[in-house]
């Protein structure tokens, strides 16, 4: 993995797990509004690190824990997981220790897809992500709901480093069709599973609610996959601060709690 950090180590820490097809730097637009108050850690999965081999979620979690200890992090105020980053964040939070006082899952989290469909998806996902590098971001609109110039560099960097083997190994232990990881009731009460009302992954919401009955399940009305984070990083950062400092979501007209 590769790690970036922003802010003062003496401040409460926020750990970000990034989405599929991008690097950890994709959280930088949000972190820009947090780094004065929080110590922000942005790991990039080995899937998107040149010369590294993805060995599974357990190994990824181990690398994150080693880095946090080396940085002297004693408190994780918040863990933020975007899209498929939820699979890694879930494994991280299920471990004892620095699991995070609050967690915010943004979009498409904990999707359940069988092994057969995942095998079929593999070559298409690989070509889609690599095409973003080959086309310098020109194919983004074909695989995502937007083609904002601000996010293209993160897709391009990820596509450059991606290998077929790493993506195959990641999908083999992510998006599993099976029982979700258990979370204690108290942890669920401080966990937010957010969905955009018009994103394709909204169909997984009922299964997540059933698995974590004590959690929080805000719906971002008329929002696409990770739209608030991409289009309004300052607003998204302010929302994260509200979760940390007040243990609640802010009152926003498009959020249905």
List the predicted regions and their residue ranges.
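Flexible "cap/lid" loop of the alpha/beta hydrolase fold
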Residues: 91-131
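Short glycine-rich catalytic loops that host catalytic nucleophiles or stabilize transition states
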Residues: 45, 218-224
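Conserved HGGG/HGGXW glycine-rich cap/lid loop of the alpha/beta-hydrolase fold
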Residues: 2-50
């Amino acid at each position: 993995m590769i790690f970036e950090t922003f802010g003062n180590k003496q401040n409460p820490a926020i750990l970000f797990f990034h989405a599929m097809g991008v690097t950890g730097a994709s959280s930088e637009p949000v972190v820009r509004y947090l780094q004065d108050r929080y110590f922000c850690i942005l790991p990039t999965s080995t899937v998107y690190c040149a010369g590294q081999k993805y060995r599974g979620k357990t190994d990824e979690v181990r690398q994150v824990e080693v880095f946090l200890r080396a940085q002297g992090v004693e408190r994780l105020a918040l863990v933020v997981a975007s899209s498929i980053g939820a699979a890694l964040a879930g494994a991280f939070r299920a471990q004892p220790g620095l699991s995070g006082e609050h967690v915010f899952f943004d979009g498409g989290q904990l999707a359940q897809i069988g092994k057969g469909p995942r095998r079929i998806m593999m070559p298409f996902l690989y070509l889609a992500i690599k095409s973003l590098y080959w086309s310098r971001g020109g194919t983004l609109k074909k695989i995502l709901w937007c083609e904002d110039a601000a996010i293209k560099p993160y897709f391009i960097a990820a596509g450059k480093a991606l290998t077929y083997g790493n993506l195959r190994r990641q999908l083999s232990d992510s998006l599993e069709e099976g029982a979700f990881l258990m979370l204690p009731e108290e942890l669920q009460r401080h966990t937010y599973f957010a969905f955009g009302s018009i994103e394709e992954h909204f169909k997984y919401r009922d299964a997540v609610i059933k698995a974590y009955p004590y959690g929080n399940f805000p719906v971002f009305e008329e929002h696409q996959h990770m739209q608030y984070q991409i289009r309004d990083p300052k607003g998204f950062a302010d929302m994260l601060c509200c979760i940390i400092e007040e243990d609640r979501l802010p009152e926003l007209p498009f959020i249905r709690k």
